[in-house]
């Protein structure tokens, strides 16, 4: 199927002429899709099935199909809140830990400030490729902006009229893409390449779907246990900021050190294009 991005992108690029012989597939784990692609490639390398692979993700959030006004819900599942929206799950987490609107707004403001500082200091320069679009050169993410606290506080709740989450404390609608090469270490050194990081452990975990954003807690615990590490052993953490409330829930419930988390800002400032985000946060962590 030529329109699948993993197949069509290499064909469109200046890749080797025999690129069509390489296997390609689509991975779907929503927000974690391209991170799951990293996991699958590393597993393939560990098993000896592959030497290297490209993990990439792309998303245009303006084209996400689930946002229409006529969704076809299965009535039995709907009664069980299976189709609860992501914003509603974040509201649940905010209520569970009594995370105030003020705390969420402060978190969002800090995300923008850190991202702006990182842009000013050139922290993203080595991870962003300049592209041309409509005769305009794009050299940096457009999301980070100087926060206007007065305007932020004037916003209405976005998902629950009595809730605490607003557009300002949610990740914005955005477009993005990210990619990386995962390779067998011996082969990389043979080719005189300079690996940026080593995958020591990986894990996924399921949670109550009405508390979707709590997933990083059990997944991180599993990954740390497999690696023989504690959260205190980790110097830097990239935590996807789907919502400020969700991020604060994970940080507080897990007892994570805020000084180590998203030091260059997160998705509330940079954006959260679903397919892109998993690999984007790994690239930023490097």
Q: What are the residue ranges of the model-derived segments?
A:
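Short, well-ordered amphipathic alpha-helical segments that serve as non-catalytic structural scaffolds
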Residues: 14-17, 37, 86-93, 109-114, ...
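N-terminal extracellular/periplasmic Venus flytrap/periplasmic-binding protein-like
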Residues: 103-190, 253, 258-260
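Flexible glycine-/small-residue-enriched beta->alpha junction loops
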Residues: 46-97
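Conserved catalytic cysteine-centered active-site region
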Residues: 14-50, 81-86, 146-172, 253-285
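Glycine- and Gly-Pro-enriched alpha-helical subdomains that act as flexible
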Residues: 185-233
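Beta-strand segments within the central parallel beta-sheet cores of soluble alpha/beta enzyme folds
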Residues: 24-29, 53-59, 103-110, 128-133, ...
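Single conserved hydrophobic/aromatic residue that forms the stacking wall/gate
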Residues: 1-16, 20
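Active-site-proximal alpha-helical scaffold in enzymes
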Residues: 29-58, 94-124, 179-186, 273-286
